[in-house]
């Protein structure tokens, strides 16, 4: 019998964690300021992690903590307390790449599940079984695996060893993220969450006897070639095949993404997964049109099926530019008596056509006839960041709804 796969979402902040849960994620993964592979200014504090666990658990969801950097000898002494603090905060699992960290997590928080990170590069069933023998509940498979090999891993591993795979988001041009380019070119280690993304830079070819003569490797509208630049992964059209290959957790990339991005992508994959689960033994899976429409309303690079069907077209894209056709302009805090109470995240004006995405996946389209500030003053637009305002809307709206507008 087919098990219902988990939809796993990224959470780079407490706010994003809450939106991911509200928009349909079964679990979220996040990090504290250290050891989390995202050395960004926004990560969770221990207090926020505790609050996030309470929020998620109250809604039947799980929280996983990433501990997937490769620590140095000097850093090892920090880990026991770090692991215990996270366990006391209520996390359901640790995501780990280093064998030493795996042993420390088992020693200092044996009650918390241990998941082996994609950074470990699990590409075959023997490696997966070793992780299981070392106490891992789950392995996050290498992103380079095709569906056929994932199915082989499933068939040759204990059934209680869970398999997790990435289904959407940015891809790294190196095998399982094992890249030294950032360290070499920018002094920032990608294996420690500090990647400067030199693979996104523009490159030209120089011949040693012709210094200063830069030759273009390929054609692009802005000159130069993005030969190392990867597309974004999108598997929604064949989510059924990933589930049937035996994947237990469908992972969305993006701990550095905004809460709008995460909510929108989670909403789309929630609908895709629920469509499959409604008739899982039908070999003619049809993705609802609105799923791809939703995925096109977030900032992204050109989409690719990744390596699931082989290597062709998995990596190279001709440009570093994003597709950004929509602007996120606000959140709905509450609704009553035909009036939506909102917070500004971007400017719009009276007469503009807007969309409101709700946590249940529904979309409300309207053109507000007026805008009113928090002190009751009628306004032509919403010029101030984070300002509170109201707009008329006859359709009831849910808290956590997101307001957006197509670029002109």
Regions found by a protein language model. Name each.
Residues 1-22, 27-34, 53, 59-69, ...:
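Surface-exposed amphipathic alpha-helical tracts and adjacent flexible/coil segments at the periphery
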Residues 41-46, 77-83:
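Glycine-rich loop at the start of a catalytic domain that most often binds anionic cofactors/ligands
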Residues 38-57:
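Glycine-rich, positively charged N-terminal anion/phosphate-binding segment
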Residues 77, 112-123:
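Gly/Gly-Pro- and Ser/Thr-rich, intrinsically disordered tail segments characteristic of DNA damage-repair
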Residues 109:
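Conserved phosphotransfer cores of two-component systems
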Residues 100-101:
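Alpha-helix capping/helix-boundary segments
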Residues 50, 63, 82, 96-97:
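Phosphodiester-processing cores and adjacent nucleic acid-binding clamps
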